[in-house]
A protein has these predicted regions:
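Short acidic-hydrophobic, aromatic-tinged amphipathic segments that line or gate anion-handling sites
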Residues: 2-11, 141-148, 200-214
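Glycine-rich, anion-gripping cofactor-binding loops and their flanking helix/strand elements
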Residues: 103-184, 282-287
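Phosphate/pyrophosphate-binding active-site segments
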Residues: 176-272
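Glycine-rich phosphate/diphosphate-binding loops that line cofactor/substrate pockets in enzymes
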Residues: 28-35, 87-100, 118, 254-260
Length: 287
């Protein structure tokens, strides 16, 4: 193809974050690295163009969120080398001793296998999307993440590892948007799957292959409040909607009517959010 990547940037204005611009340009350059060719970048500068002092540009408030990165000789997205077999990250022995959060987005049933037990062994918090097929350790996250005290403690995690993409829960998306620590993405594609444009380490791999290459370290949970809140939510939801006949009640009890070896198709966007917030699906159930 000619060019191998095209980037049509909007007219420059401060509303567009610097990290968005960097990750967008790096994504195009990464495609060029995989397939030699031309990258076309279109920048519609508004006229007239004024002279500017380089010192003023370097100290502009727009660049403040990325000043630390600008002083370091590394890419915004650290793409791990493509290998036939997933290799363990060189610093995994250190990172697995830290406080971590696992977020599981849309995954195939094959890739969903093992994430629950891996996170449980690590003592890390597991946040799951209804599309993940992963049985949550702390269900009803879209509800209990409304607790600002617990959310702030969760944001103190040292590392977040994201499997898959496309999260339905608004509160999980808000958590991801606010997190500022080490961020890893495991997704078997070259597509950009992080709408928040974190500086990150990116693994182009299937989730279960990545888990096999990164053995867990058995340790106690570093944060107990999410488990306590999820148990409270289970009781509260049952009390509020358990005996009623409405959409919320169906969403909460939908796992009771699922056929064995079936596939769940949710076509209404509001009902999808209710199911994501109010129910627990069996491990690996396709949706």
């Amino acid at each position: 193809d000619y060019p191998v990547a095209s980037v049509n940037l909007p007219k420059p204005q401060a509303d567009y974050a610097a990290k968005w611009l960097i990750s967008t340009l790096e994504q195009a350059c990464y495609k060029q690295k995989q397939q030699a060719g031309v990258v076309h970048i279109n920048v519609p500068f508004a006229e007239p163009l004024y002279n500017a002092q380089e010192q003023e540009i370097d100290g502009h408030p727009w660049l403040m969120p990325i000043q630390r990165w600008l002083s370091q000789p590394k890419n915004w997205v650290d793409h791990q080398p493509l290998q036939q077999e997933v290799l363990m990250h060189e610093n995994w022995d250190t990172w697995r001793t830290k406080r971590g959060v696992i977020v599981a987005g849309q995954l195939t049933p094959e890739q969903a296998m093992g994430i629950n037990s891996w996170a449980n062994t690590m003592g890390w918090i597991l946040l799951t999307d209804i599309q993940s097929g992963v049985e949550p350790l702390t269900p009803y996250a879209d509800i209990w993440l409304a607790n600002q005290t617990v959310k702030q403690k969760l944001l103190q995690a040292d590392i977040v590892i994201q499997f898959g993409s496309r999260f339905i829960s608004k509160r999980i998306n808000q958590f991801l948007a606010e997190f500022q620590g080490e961020f890893w993405v495991v997704e078997q594609s070259q597509n950009a799957v992080d709408p928040n444009h974190h500086t990150q380490t990116r693994f182009n791999a299937k989730a279960h292959h990545w888990l096999r290459a990164h053995p867990p370290l058995r340790q106690k949970p570093w944060l107990l409040e999410p488990l306590a809140l999820s148990k409270f939510c289970a009781t509260f939801i049952e009390q509020q909607v358990g005996g009623n006949l409405n959409e919320a009640s169906l969403a909460h009890h939908i796992e009771r009517v699922l056929p064995y070896n079936g596939i769940l198709f949710l076509g209404n966007s509001l009902f999808v959010r209710l199911v994501d917030a109010l129910t627990k699906l069996p491990e690996g159930y396709p949706i």
